[in-house]
Amino acid sequence: MKYILFLLPLFSWSCKTIDIPEPIVELVDPPMPILPVSQINVPIEIDLQSQLKDVEKSLPKSFEGKQEQCEGVSFAYKFIREPIHFQLKKTSFYYEVDGKFELKLNYCPKCHSLWDENGSCTVPRIYASCGVGEPMRRVKVGYNTNVSITDSYLFNTETKLQLFDVLDPCEITVFKYDATSQVEKQVKGQLQSLEKDIDRQIESVDIRSSIKDVWRQLEEPMDLSGYGLLYFKPKSMSLSPVTFDAVNKRAEVTAELTAEPFITTNREPAVYSDLPKQAKYTKGQGYALNILVKASYDSINKIMNKDLMGYKIPFNGKEIVVDSLHILGNQEQKLIIQVYFSGSKKGEFFLVGTPLITDDQFFVLTNLAYDLNSKSVLLKTAKWMFDKRILEELNKSAKYDLNPLLNETKNTITQQLNSKLDDGVFLSGTVDRLAVSSIQLGTSGFFLTTEVSGNLKL
């Protein structure tokens, strides 16, 4: 009878649900970690075919000139050019243009001003011509245009006439006069004055819009299909020297940007800004992002429950069954985990543990222990739960492989990096590395420092 009376209190305790007051959690987020500046290098291709056609159309197709004098040789000329076919070299344009000219001349050996203050020829003038009433005389012209990009993201050009070759000389036999040098002097002068026109037209080619499109696209959030939104937050830009693809008639330049990217599950308004003044180009490659990922505690709750829900811990004829886990928040950068359990006892208790990310990308809760309230209640209701084997089992199981999630995220980002951004604007890229390097706890979630690297192309 005494033995039965002795067991009654234990029996009554075993029927009760263990109820423990919730711990106090942090209500203020800690200062955010200062991350290294992220680098993004985006090769940009700008199609010049239609724009160079516009340049060609805008340049004069012909010009005329004359030089009249009473005594000696007077002449008038007309020059007509064929269409310009731009040849793109590595860092410049070179183009040879076929042209043709006609020349009308007259010659007076001696003038006097007796009857005319402008002078009059003492004998009848001798007239001659080249390319008039016959095929016009041929000439080959060549220009070279060096191209760079200004701090304002515009073409800056310097065009020079490099070739002027008269293929059909103009020799006037009637008065033994070789007009070739005179033609060269006059027409060449006109062609040299054309250098500035060529510069103006090429500099009017709009490359700023293409570069601004890159900047604007990086200001837009990238939807990671269920994993949140990636905000690049570009801060500065510099451009590589421009080069040209001769086959496809396009300009190629690499935009080198610095950024402060982050990932969040909550959409934030995009912040737009004008193109910044160009920074110094450092010749980087690909992209290397240090991203602050804002992840809610629910995301880890799902992973923990998937691995630990239903987990059984037997001990000396008793058993604890983990029904579910829930992260409440943190205390001094230690997670507070609410554990609902059943088995020999039923109820809840709270654990505290320090999270860390291992080099092989596992989320690990280390130094798991009961919080103070749990210790106090369990000492009175279920002292046997203090056995170190229970915490050892929980510590051993509190390790979660992030690699499947990271690989899935990597594939999602890769898909987003290979998509159409706008009409005629396509983004392509790869993700070579995605890894979490550190973790910090906030009031409602984690701040994960994530390193992402790969290549981009527009």
What are these regions (language model features)?
Residues 12-14:
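C-terminal motif of bacterial Sec signal peptides marking the signal peptidase cleavage site
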